[in-house]
Amino acid sequence: MEHSLNSLNNFDFLARSFARMHAEGRPVDILAVTGNMDEEHRTWFCARYAWYCQQMMQTRELELEH
C-alpha cells in the first residue's frame, strides 16, 4: 500500500510539473509522457494533469485581471 501511495505522489508531482510547463507555454507531449503507463495509471495521470492545467490557467487569468 505504501509503495502504491508513493507512486501516486510521484505521478501527482509529475502531472503538476508538466501542467506548469504547459502553462508557461512549453511544449508537453502527454502521449509520450504516459506511453509506458498502464491504462489505470494513464487515466488517473491524465485527469490530474488536466485538473492542474485548469487550475494554473485560472490562476494565470486572475493574475492578469489584477
From Swiss-Prot:
Which InterPro entries does the record match to this protein? Answer: GlgS, GlgS_sf
* GO biological process: one example: negative regulation of single-species biofilm formation
A matching Pfam family: GlgS
Coiled-coil intervals, chain numbering: none
Q: What does this protein do?
A: Major determinant of cell surface composition. Negatively regulates motility, adhesion and synthesis of biofilm exopolysaccharides.
What protein family is recorded?
Belongs to the GlgS family.
Q: List the protein's name.
A: Surface composition regulator
